[in-house]
């Protein structure tokens, strides 16, 4: 079981529990990690970002996606406030759907070194074409239950 929560003053490196400025770019954003108290157990963590936003690198128009991030943690967990700030930093970032989705997955994997990670980027149509992007690291640890991401393929009105 977890120990007594620390006060922010005891965790000076974390953004959690303190006022921080919104990062303006993904490169500027800091992803915090915290020790996994269940590191000896294989299990799954899921983050859902149904209102992810970035900018088209050509037109500057907003692009919208439903992101699903699943990972089997190792020694580290992603701290969720820092993930929220990192994802929000894409609001003023111009990149194609594929680049955004894969870059997010790679950055998280680099920071926390999970046993396994996958990201699904379900992008809303631009120019009449929805784009879904999927990326993962290696193989899922044996015995870890991974539910379907459950985001339906875009059908429009037809």
Curated annotation (Swiss-Prot):
The EC number(s) this enzyme carries: 1.7.1.13
Chain positions recorded as substrate binding sites: 78-80, 97-98
Gene3D superfamilies according to UniProt: 3.30.1130.10
Assigned GO CC terms: cytoplasm
Keywords assigned by UniProt, alphabetized: Cytoplasm, NADP, Oxidoreductase, Queuosine biosynthesis
Protein name, UniProt field: NADPH-dependent 7-cyano-7-deazaguanine reductase
Record-linked PANTHER family: NADPH-DEPENDENT 7-CYANO-7-DEAZAGUANINE REDUCTASE (PTHR34354:SF1)
Organism: Rhodopseudomonas palustris (strain BisB18)
Top-rank taxon, per record: Bacteria
Pathway(s) per entry: tRNA modification; tRNA-queuosine biosynthesis
Enzyme class: oxidoreductase
HAMAP family per the UniProt record, alphabetical: QueF_type1
Region: Disordered, residue numbers: 1-35
Catalyzed chemical reaction(s): 7-aminomethyl-7-carbaguanine + 2 NADP(+) = 7-cyano-7-deazaguanine + 2 NADPH + 3 H(+)
Gene Ontology MF term list: preQ1 synthase activity
Transmembrane feature ranges: none
Entry annotation: catalytic residues: 56 (thioimide intermediate), 63 (proton donor)
UniProt gene name: queF
InterPro entries referenced in this protein's UniProt entry, alphabetically: GTP-CH-I_C/QueF, NADPH_dep_7-cyano-7-deazaG_red, QueF, QueF_type1
């Amino acid at each position: 079981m977890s120990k007594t929560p620390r006060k922010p003053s005891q965790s000076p490196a974390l953004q959690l529990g303190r006022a921080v400025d919104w990062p303006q770019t993904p490169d500027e954003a800091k992803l915090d990690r915290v020790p996994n108290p269940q590191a000896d157990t294989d299990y799954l963590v899921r983050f859902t970002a149904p209102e992810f936003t970035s900018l088209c690198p050509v037109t500057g128009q907003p692009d919208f996606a439903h992101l699903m991030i699943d990972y089997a943690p190792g020694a580290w967990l992603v701290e969720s406030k820092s993930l929220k700030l990192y994802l929000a930093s894409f609001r003023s970032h111009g990149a194609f759907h594929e680049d955004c989705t894969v870059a997010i997955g790679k950055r998280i994997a680099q920071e926390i070194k999970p046993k396994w990670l996958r990201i699904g980027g379900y992008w809303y149509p631009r120019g009449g074409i929805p784009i879904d992007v999927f990326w993962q690291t290696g193989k899922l640890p044996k015995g870890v239950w991974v539910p379907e991401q459950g985001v339906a393929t875009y059908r429009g009105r037809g």
